[in-house]
């Protein structure tokens, strides 16, 4: 057997970054990486450290800072978010033990899900509550239905893309039956579905953080996840969002500069997160994800005998993830290079006269995508020049009356550009009838519209 290189006492169970680890040393290795990020600057130190009276503040001020230091953890029940929560729980326990019951921060956990998966998700959350019962006063759980995205007190809108000039027309929509499921059913492919779902989940999470005055959102993204997101954003025409996506040092300007986004797992590979979850027994809490055994000497995951998912059926994120999964073992430095390079990017120069946000994803539009697309594409139909072409067109019109009527209607309707980014224009291009039912953003309404949660039974009662 190989001996652990850290403690030099126990047998190694896995190898990471070409170094053999025993279980105990590896858990400490991963935990310290997250805790190092938690102390990365003064803002996060003020959140996670216990405040005591000093020359600058009295006892009351110190206690208030400890009480107000609350963070939100979006829990997808994948390995990365489970690991982030587990390390926070261990940190709280250590603070209680070493500071006579005091802690420096509070944690609230939010899980977004659909109605179809609610019962399974609720069961997983109940198990987690039981596991972390020693911190039941410091860790609170919330489950929110993803259809709360449309259950808001302000108007819905129907956004239509006109392919001949890439402009968008918006009409008010009072459709009470609009749901996330119906919107996804109109999406052209898995990449578009994933893109829209990511926008919906992100908005719900950040809205929750804004309403409840959280200091930070702790996103459970590994280094591998961040790398595949950098590549995917680039391919999907959302490269301008990379700088903001990886920014842990600024308050979120799109949500009233109320909180910071934070990625405590940005120095840890997904395979390392999976190994941590297996050692700590967190695999039982995962949902729609199988913890992998990539780093372990003794394998425990049944490998499929054939490639189940074809490349043509994969989303852009899945393709990027597959690539990084394949190189993690021998070329993990490529993953860290992608993340470091993305973190060095800054926001593009704004070429518009004002700050404009995309009506769909809320990203800042730095350059008019309509003008850019108009310069590189030919979207208008070829002009009819002779009798033969006119005869062919009339024959097509007679054979396709519905399409012809729709085409004429779209051509006659004046287009109005309401501000949609290039990435969302790409998504709209493939939507059914190039239409999308969406919310009309209103900052004041965002603050007053409280998200409704599913009820989770307390520890001492059943509901």
Curated annotation (Swiss-Prot):
One of its GO terms (molecular function) is sulfurtransferase activity. GO terms for cellular component: cytosol. GO terms for biological process: protein urmylation; tRNA thio-modification; tRNA wobble position uridine thiolation; tRNA wobble uridine modification. Its main location: cytoplasm. Pathway: tRNA modification; 5-methoxycarbonylmethyl-2-thiouridine-tRNA biosynthesis. It is found in: Cytoplasm. Pfam families: CTU2. It comes from the Eukaryota. Keywords: Cytoplasm, tRNA processing. Plays a central role in 2-thiolation of mcm(5)S(2)U at tRNA wobble positions of tRNA(Lys), tRNA(Glu) and tRNA(Gln). May act by forming a heterodimer with NCS6 that ligates sulfur from thiocarboxylated URM1 onto the uridine of tRNAs at wobble position. Prior mcm(5) tRNA modification by the elongator complex is required for 2-thiolation. May also be involved in protein urmylation. HAMAP family: CTU2. Belongs to the CTU2/NCS2 family. This is Cytoplasmic tRNA 2-thiolation protein 2. The lineage of its organism: Eukaryota, Fungi, Dikarya, Ascomycota, Saccharomycotina. The gene is NCS2.
């Amino acid at each position: 057997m190989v001996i652990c290189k850290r403690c030099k006492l126990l047998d190694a169970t896995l190898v990471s970054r070409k170094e053999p680890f025993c279980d105990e040393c590896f858990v400490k290795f991963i935990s310290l990486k997250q805790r190092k990020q938690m102390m990365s600057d003064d803002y996060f130190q003020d959140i996670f450290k216990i405040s005591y009276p000093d020359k600058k503040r009295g006892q009351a001020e110190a206690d208030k800072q400890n009480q107000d230091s609350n963070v939100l953890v979006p829990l997808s029940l994948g390995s990365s978010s489970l690991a982030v929560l587990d390390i926070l729980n261990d940190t709280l326990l250590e603070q209680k033990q070493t500071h006579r019951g005091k802690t420096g921060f509070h944690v609230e956990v939010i899980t977004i899900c659909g109605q179809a998966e609610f019962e399974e998700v609720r069961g997983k959350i109940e198990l987690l509550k039981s596991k972390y019962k020693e911190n039941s006063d410091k860790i609170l759980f919330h489950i929110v239905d993803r259809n709360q995205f449309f259950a808001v007190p302000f108007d819905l809108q129907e956004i239509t893309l006109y392919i001949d000039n890439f402009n968008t027309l918006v009409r008010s929509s009072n459709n009470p039956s609009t749901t996330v499921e119906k919107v996804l059913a109109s999406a052209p492919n898995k990449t578009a579905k994933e893109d829209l779902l990511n926008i919906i989940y992100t908005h719900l999470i950040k809205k929750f953080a804004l309403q409840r005055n959280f200091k930070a959102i702790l996103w459970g993204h590994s280094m591998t996840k961040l790398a595949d997101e950098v590549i995917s954003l680039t391919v999907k025409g959302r490269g301008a969002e990379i700088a903001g996506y990886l920014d842990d040092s600024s308050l979120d300007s799109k949500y009233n500069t109320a909180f910071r986004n934070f990625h405590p797992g940005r120095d840890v590979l997904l395979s390392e997160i999976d190994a941590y979850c297996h050692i700590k027994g967190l695999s039982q809490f995962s949902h729609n994800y199988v913890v992998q055994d990539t780093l372990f000497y003794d394998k425990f995951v049944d490998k499929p005998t054939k490639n189940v998912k074809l490349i043509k059926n994969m989303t852009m994120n899945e393709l990027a993830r597959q690539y990084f999964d394949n190189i993690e073992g021998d070329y993990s430095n490529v993953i860290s290079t992608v993340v470091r390079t993305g973190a060095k990017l800054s926001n593009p120069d704004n070429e518009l006269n004002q700050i404009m946000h995309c009506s769909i994803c809320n990203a800042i539009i730095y350059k008019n995508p309509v003008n850019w697309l108009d310069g590189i594409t030919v979207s208008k139909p070829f002009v009819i020049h002779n009798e033969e072409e006119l005869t062919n067109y009339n024959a097509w019109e007679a054979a396709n009356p519905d399409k012809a009527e729709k085409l004429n209607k779209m051509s006659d309707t004046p287009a109005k550009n309401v501000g949609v980014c290039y990435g969302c224009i790409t998504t709209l291009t493939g939507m059914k009838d190039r239409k999308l039912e969406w919310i009309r953003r209103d900052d004041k309404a965002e603050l007053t519209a409280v998200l409704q949660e599913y009820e989770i039974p307390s520890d001492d009662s059943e509901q």
